């Protein structure tokens, strides 16, 4: 009888797995169209058209119940050409006037200077299973508001797309560079009435992945970049021209005040970075929604907040005013033809400098090294030095712990000697010693049924504490890890009389094409020696390599490998 029950349970599990693998999508875009138009007078139009059929209650009540359009009414006009729902029986339900709701975009909530921005929320009505949502709108920008046609678009949507049309239209004498990558499609090019139009027609695009850590930077997500700037250099120059020079009187006064009494460039840099990160609020208004413009340093001083670009301007200016030569650079989302990379394709702005022979790659929103310092998959290009590529050396990812643990019936005291690469360490703050150097910690022990558990300390920045150690068994996309991990921990645990090691001695080694993990426990007299090490061969892994990588990371993230069980007499 037990065998029958077990077989039945196994069958149910297999059926559930099959259902999840071959489950129908929540919805499907029957048609999706995006048209980007740059007119001869400098005005721009964006035309969006979709037909979306709903298949599930989640799609109807949550995922696709509303559409959102952010725009600047001072310089842009939004026109809803059509908005209605076609129900399964053919009945048409037009979107009523009170279903068009204007709100403040979430990104502008704490930024009064950007409270003029609007977000049109289109509440779709008449929804039911099998209904199709129709939405067609045009967003027109006045001449000069957007400097050039500047596009970055990841093509996969949250549901499959049956027919997807993307077109770019510019005056025929205007330069147009574009990159369509990770999807096989050739555009058609037509010229009529002095306008050149480039069109892609794509069919049967799958839904975007819901796996963790999926990014176009990983090199396998379809995307489009396009730009009518004469060059990438010109695009960056247009942004950098708005930056405040280090000779600015107010900038110099602030820099002098922040660095007063500091003994060296490192202390000056730390004071300036801490001020920009902690004392100047961060507004998440994207550069595009700000019209690719930034407010002045003076506005930042009086408002005490800024966008990423505005805070970058402040950080760059203060460092240079303090005599620390700094360079601003743009880190891009993807690796594409540089000519097609405008400002929309920028992932983050960073400030790079050296202080007392140490390189700093700084974000104006974080006290740690900017993400660009870890990621060498996409280009980093200088604003300061007119579009020159910036070479960022691969960071040292080594972590080495030597730990002596002294156990008594009441507690376990650990003496840690940590060597952690500078790349992991915060650039300022009193807690740097908690990451590297010497540290003492104590753990209270309480016997339970004649046993106590001793937890072995490890680095707070260890990959073992990340979600990378808890991923699904299969993956269809590339995986870019935050670093090429190289961690080693050696523990010497002194066990007193009256207590014995209950964890079995063992040596576990997993070595494959992705790297190597070693977990060993050995008894040596009254001491127990534990070794844990992880070494990965690279940072970017393909789906074919994922199984090997997951085996290593799952073992590395297993918390039981950091616990010793001791018996108490």
Language-model segments: what does each one mean?
Residues 1-7:
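Positively charged n-region of N-terminal signal peptides that target proteins for export
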Residues 9-20:
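Bacterial N-terminal signal peptides
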Residues 24-569:
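A sensor for short, sequence-defined functional sites
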């Amino acid at each position: 009888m037990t065998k029958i029950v077990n077989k039945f349970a196994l069958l149910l599990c297999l059926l559930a797995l099959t259902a999840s693998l071959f489950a129908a999508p929540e919805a499907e875009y029957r048609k999706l169209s995006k048209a980007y138009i740059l007119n001869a007078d400098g005005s721009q139009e964006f035309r969006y058209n979709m037909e979306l059929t709903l298949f599930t209650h989640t799609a109807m009540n949550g995922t696709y119940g509303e559409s959102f359009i952010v725009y600047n009414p001072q310089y842009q006009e939004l026109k809803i050409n059509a908005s209605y729902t076609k129900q399964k029986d053919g009945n048409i339900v037009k979107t009523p006037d009170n279903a068009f709701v204007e709100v403040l975009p979430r990104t502008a909530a704490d930024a009064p200077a950007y409270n003029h921005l609007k977000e049109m929320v289109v509440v779709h009505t008449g929804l039911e299973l099998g209904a199709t949502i129709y939405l067609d709108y045009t967003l027109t920008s006045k001449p000069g508001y957007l400097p050039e046609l500047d596009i970055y678009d990841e093509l996969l949507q949250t549901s499959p797309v049956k027919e997807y049309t993307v077109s770019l239209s510019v005056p025929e004498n205007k330069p147009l560079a574009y990159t369509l990558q990770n999807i096989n499609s050739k555009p058609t090019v037509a010229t009529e009435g002095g306008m050149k139009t480039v069109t892609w027609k794509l069919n049967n695009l799958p839904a975007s992945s819901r796996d963790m850590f999926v990014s176009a930077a990983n090199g396998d997500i379809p995307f489009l970049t396009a730009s009518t700037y004469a060059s990438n250099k010109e695009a960056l120059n247009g942004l950098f021209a708005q930056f405040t020079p280090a000779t600015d009187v107010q900038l110099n006064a602030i820099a002098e005040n922040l660095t007063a009494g500091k003994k060296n460039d490192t202390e000056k840099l730390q004071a300036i970075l801490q001020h920009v990160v902690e004392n100047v609020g961060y507004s998440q208004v994207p550069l595009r929604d700000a019209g690719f413009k930034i407010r002045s340093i003076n506005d930042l001083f009086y408002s005490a907040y800024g966008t990423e670009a505005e805070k970058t301007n402040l950080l760059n200016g203060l460092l240079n005013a303090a005599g620390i030569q700094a360079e601003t650079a743009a880190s891009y989302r993807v690796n594409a033809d540089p000519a097609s990379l405008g400002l929309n394709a920028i992932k983050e702005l960073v400030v790079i400098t050296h202080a007392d022979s140490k390189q700093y790659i700084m974000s104006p929103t974080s006290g740690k090294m900017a993400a660009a310092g870890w990621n060498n998959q996409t280009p980093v290009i200088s604003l300061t030095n007119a579009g020159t590529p910036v070479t960022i050396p691969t960071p040292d990812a080594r972590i080495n712990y030597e730990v002596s643990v002294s156990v008594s019936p009441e507690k376990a005291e650990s003496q840690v000697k940590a060597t952690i690469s500078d790349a992991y360490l915060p650039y300022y703050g009193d807690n740097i010693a908690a990451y590297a150097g010497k540290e003492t910690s104590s753990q209270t022990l309480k016997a339970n049924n004649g046993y106590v558990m001793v937890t072995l300390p490890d680095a707070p920045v260890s990959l073992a504490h990340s979600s990378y150690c808890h991923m699904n068994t299969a993956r269809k996309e590339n995986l870019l890890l935050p670093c090429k991990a190289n961690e080693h921990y050696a523990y010497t645990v002194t066990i007193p009389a009256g207590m014995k090691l209950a964890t079995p001695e063992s040596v576990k080694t997993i070595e494959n094409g992705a790297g190597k993990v070693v977990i060993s426990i050995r008894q040596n007299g009254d001491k127990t020696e534990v070794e844990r090490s992880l070494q990965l061969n690279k940072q970017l892994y393909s789906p074919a390599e994922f199984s090997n990588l997951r085996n290593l990371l799952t073992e590395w993230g297993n918390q039981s490998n950091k616990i010793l069980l001791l018996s108490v007499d």
